[in-house]
Amino acid sequence: MPSYIRDHRKRLRERFMTGGAAALPDYELLELVLFRSIPRQDVKPLARLLLDTFGDFNRVLTAPVERLAEVKGVGEAVITDLKILEASAHRMARARVMQRQVISSWDALLDYCHTTMAHRETEQFRVFYLDRKNVLIADEEQARGTVDHVPVYPREVAKRALELNASALILVHNHPSGDPTPSQSDIDMTARIRSACEALGLTLHDHLIIGKSVELSFRAEGYL
């Protein structure tokens, strides 16, 4: 490895350890990740290329494997390390909300939703199942869809609640466009799930739509 690359890596690591992530712009933080994947090359051009391609650090981590593989210079090692980092972030955020009362950890729940869903390029539909004390007992992905639609089956959602011995649930899905405004199909689907829940004595607390940097609550906006 050329000495200038070795010295640059050393300085960057020292800045990170001294000032934390806040001391580094996105491309330098991404460089730190790439140091492990590509141990003997200058990774700054690749870091900048990834950011130019996907937009920001979060979108690089959450980019589909197929799209990452299309970027020149990205191999299996890079993809693996990026996806390990993404999975770690998801797991940390999830740990803050599982087996906890939703009301007391609402901000953490929203953070988890944004971490796992805000930067997806296609729609994903999740259900949070709660017990009688409103403790989150299960977080399950029900369906994945296209850029503007995800198929959801109300009876399956309600049936799964009974299997888990849940008493209430919260629906969550993302809008890849970044705008969390509900479509008419979102409203209609929520109404069908609410009816299925009521028929079984279940409570639908809310339906959250996750945008790029903001969420919409059906309950707060009067849709429920």
UniProtKB/Swiss-Prot annotation:
Q: Where, by residue number, does Zn(2+) bind?
A: H173, H175, D186
Source organism of this protein record? Ruegeria pomeroyi (strain ATCC 700808 / DSM 15171 / DSS-3) (Silicibacter pomeroyi)
Instruction: Write the lineage as a comma-separated list.
Output: Bacteria, Pseudomonadati, Pseudomonadota, Alphaproteobacteria, Rhodobacterales
Please name the PANTHER family in this protein's record.
Answer: DNA REPAIR PROTEIN RADC, UPF0758 PROTEIN YEES-RELATED
Q: Does the keyword Hydrolase apply?
A: yes
Instruction: Please give the superkingdom of this protein's source.
Output: Bacteria
Q: Name one GO molecular function term.
A: metal ion binding
Any GO BP annotation: proteolysis
- Entry-linked InterPro entries: MPN (IPR037518), RadC_JAB (IPR025657), RuvA_2-like (IPR010994), UPF0758 (IPR001405), UPF0758_CS (IPR020891), UPF0758_N (IPR046778)
Q: Protein name, please? A: UPF0758 protein SPO0054
State the family it belongs to.
Belongs to the UPF0758 family.
**Which keywords does the record carry?**
Hydrolase, Metal-binding, Metalloprotease, Protease, Zinc
List the ranges annotated as motif JAMM motif.
173-186
Report domain MPN positions.
102-224
